[in-house]
Amino acid sequence: MLHTTPSGLLIIDKPQGVTSFDAVAAVRGALHIKKVGHAGTLDPMATGTLVIAFGHATRLLNAIVAHDKTYEATIRLGLRTTTDDAEGEVLVDDEARSRWQTLSAQLTEGGQSGEPTALPTASWQDLLTRTIATNFTGDIEQVPNTFSAIKINGQRAYDLAREGKDVELKPRPVTISEFTVLDIRSGFVAGEQTAEPLREDANTGAIPALDVDVRISCSSGTYIRALARDLGKELGVGGYLTRLRRTRVGRFALPDDASGLIAPEAMLDTRTHTVTAHTDQKTFTNREGQTVTRNKCVLDTPEGLAGDERRNWLLDHALTMEQAARGAMPALDITPEEASELRFGRRIERTISEPTAAIVPQTHDVAAIIERANAHQAKPVTVFPLA
């Protein structure tokens, strides 16, 4: 299928080790389109749903960013790190160690509180369920991570933190609609190996810990690293994130999403539109003349495709402008005459209560994003050219 000036969405399954911007750069290079953006940053350690818009669909990104999201993650309890994830340095916390020993004695029948103990997972299940239900479900206040992209007086929080400056972020309201414990594994962490799987044996210096696999559905702006930190803090033993995968952004979901929060008839069929990717390396010479090697994101396409063939394959796997608009916000079917009126900046006689995509269904023409003008009329706030 030949594509000339395309607009739409690609649902990228972002691999670990690259930034969201790396994925955007991969799409921009493959499609030869300058106007490309994404709906919500994923950290390099995270994988999963990255909604990337190109062409006129980039004007839908603000709506998509605001959608709720689902993640599957692993929270390690028993230690804290400087960044609240496995990329940070371990923080020695004698109070947390003492609390772990106390819990060990309480949750293990006949346990000795003076020795490192891998606690039985059955005992933890009940404690975690009660703690999550009481403190981390529904509407809560959350302090974002110090190492976050939030700006403070024009500077990113993570830049200030790396410079050793004090970073004070205010709590913000978030909503947790699901926080389910999927699996629990107990074991030991050897030294500074914060990202390694738990060991079964307690070598000298090993720290007892618990890996908790969870599924979390939450409002936009929720920091899963902060939930890991706060769960560990509430239990008194410390906690950080070792794995994070985003499986859903609003109605845009990966095939492995198991949240069940969106009715099947409302969920977009992104199975045939998801494009996987992998991490590779690129070597280049920077402006200082130094040879630098860093990770890059490579989109997975059939072997042998290149140039226009590869571009067209990706576009054939993208959501169309109409599919993108219907997934991004409420949609209203309009007539060709109404589409013409909207493109001239005129109001149409329609009753709506929220920003809505105005679409001519017969021609799949997304004419505009409209909003309420008065009780009986809607007005255009964003107009799209006729494709």
From Swiss-Prot:
Domain of life (superkingdom): Bacteria
Residues at the active site: D43
Reactions accelerated catalytically: uridine(55) in tRNA = pseudouridine(55) in tRNA
Protein name according to UniProt: tRNA pseudouridine synthase B
GO annotation, biological process: mRNA pseudouridine synthesis; tRNA pseudouridine synthesis
Purpose of the protein: Responsible for synthesis of pseudouridine from uracil-55 in the psi GC loop of transfer RNAs.
Keywords noted in UniProt: Isomerase, tRNA processing
Record EC number: 5.4.99.25
CDD domains in the record: PseudoU_synth_EcTruB (cd02573)
Similarity comment: family membership: Belongs to the pseudouridine synthase TruB family. Type 1 subfamily.
Any one Pfam family match given in the protein's UniProt record, by short name: TruB_C
One of the record's GO molecular function terms: tRNA pseudouridine(55) synthase activity
PANTHER family per record: PSEUDOURIDYLATE SYNTHASE TRUB1, TRNA-PSEUDOURIDINE SYNTHASE
Keyword tRNA-binding tagged: no
